[in-house]
């Protein structure tokens, strides 16, 4: 399970070049993933955007990794993204470009006999909840869109980094992780923001056989801040109102097939209004057709305690001109009370390239 421990570290740092790190005792690497997307959807013509049905977006993620020695590593991930890029941006106004520090942490790794390992990280990192955050990079995500629970704007699991500490451990076929951070994944707070409260998250998994792993995760802690849209007058102190999430996940790979799935339940507590709950889930499959082409699909749903739910169906054909580039052709069908006819459907093309900009190694 030594390989799995390294995967835990790389996933938390959004795939920051573990293979390179294994080749040398110390050194520095800067890896980059750049993507561009062009979606077409009638959602883009609705208020408040009121724009053309066709638009474009770009995204770049820089992954610096400084390996100090065989046990200590400093890793980071910095993202520059234009708006709109993902479907959740379609309901926002105007255009813009924003930079975000997603990851910056110091890690320590140890291995022992009998497939045991521990990775300790301190700094800014992604939430330990869920499974999709390991595939946030467009080169790792076979689809163009993202599952409904994940995102930037009031989603129960943020893509943005949280500040704290995490321990990942493996023992044989078991793996586990525990995390304590400065804010909830349901409402990420910067270390410079008010209303920061400690939050716990963790998860565990078991590899039934090679290629098949099942797991679960959870988080708990205060999430509201006094400027939150749903923090109404007369509400209780934010630190007494927790958000909680529980989830199950599965990953399977066999031959030319890969599949992923998650089921999640979230609850946000209030005093002046009823508690809000959300159920969501998705199933995703990818079939490699030949060395250059693959087909992928994702089916997802959302159900809420207040308001109607929705479901989505995304289909993608992917083409790899070479090992460093990927072109995706996708179509998404979104159904729900907020969509009329084909209004929520999205046709999109995404181009992705990944390369190693700097690599300095020292034995």
Which sequence ranges carry the predicted segments?
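Gram-negative outer-membrane beta-barrel proteins
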Residues: 36-44, 82-88, 112, 128-132, ...
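Detector for outer-membrane/organellar transmembrane beta-barrel domains
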Residues: 24-27, 171-176, 195, 205-305
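Sec/Tat signal peptide C-region and signal peptidase I cleavage site
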Residues: 15-21
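Hydrophobic, lipid-facing positions within transmembrane beta-strands of outer-membrane proteins
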Residues: 56-62, 99-106, 161-165, 198-202, ...
């Amino acid at each position: 399970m030594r390989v799995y421990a390294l995967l835990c570290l790389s996933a938390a740092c959004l795939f920051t070049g573990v293979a390179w790190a294994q080749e040398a005792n110390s050194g520095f690497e800067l890896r980059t993933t750049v993507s561009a997307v062009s979606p077409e959807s009638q959602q883009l013509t609705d208020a408040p955007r009121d724009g053309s049905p066709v638009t474009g977006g770009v995204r770049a993620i820089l992954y610096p990794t400084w390996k100090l020695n065989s046990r200590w590593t400093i890793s980071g991930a910095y993202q520059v993204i234009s708006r709109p890029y993902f479907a959740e941006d379609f309901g926002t106004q105007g255009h813009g470009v924003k930079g975000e520090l997603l990851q910056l942490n110091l890690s320590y790794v140890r291995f022992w006999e009998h497939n045991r390992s521990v990775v300790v990280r301190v700094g800014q990192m992604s939430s330990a909840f869920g499974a999709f955050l390991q595939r946030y990079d467009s080169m790792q995500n076979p689809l163009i869109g993202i599952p409904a629970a994940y995102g930037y704007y009031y989603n129960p699991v943020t893509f943005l980094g949280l500040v704290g500490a995490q321990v990942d451990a493996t023992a044989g076929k078991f793996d586990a992780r525990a995390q304590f951070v400065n804010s909830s994944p349901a409402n990420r707070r910067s270390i410079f923001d008010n209303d920061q409260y400690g939050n716990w998250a963790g998860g565990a998994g078991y590899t039934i056989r090679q290629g098949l792993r099942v797991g679960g995760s959870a988080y708990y802690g205060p999430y509201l801040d006094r400027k939150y849209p749903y923090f109404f007058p007369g509400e209780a102190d934010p630190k007494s109102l927790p958000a909680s999430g529980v989830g199950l996940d599965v990953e399977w790979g066999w031959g030319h097939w890969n599949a992923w799935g998650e089921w999640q339940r979230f609850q946000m507590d209030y005093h002046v209004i009823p508690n809000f709950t959300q159920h969501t889930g998705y199933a995703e499959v990818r079939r490699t057709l030949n060395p250059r082409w693959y087909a992928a699909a994702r089916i997802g749903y959302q159900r809420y305690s207040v308001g109607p739910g929705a479901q989505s169906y995304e289909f993608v054909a992917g083409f790899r001109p070479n090992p460093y580039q990927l072109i995706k052709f996708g179509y998404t069908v979104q159904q729900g009370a907020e969509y009329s006819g084909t209004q929520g459907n999205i046709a999109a093309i995404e181009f992705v390239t990944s390369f190693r900009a700097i690599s300095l190694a020292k034995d």
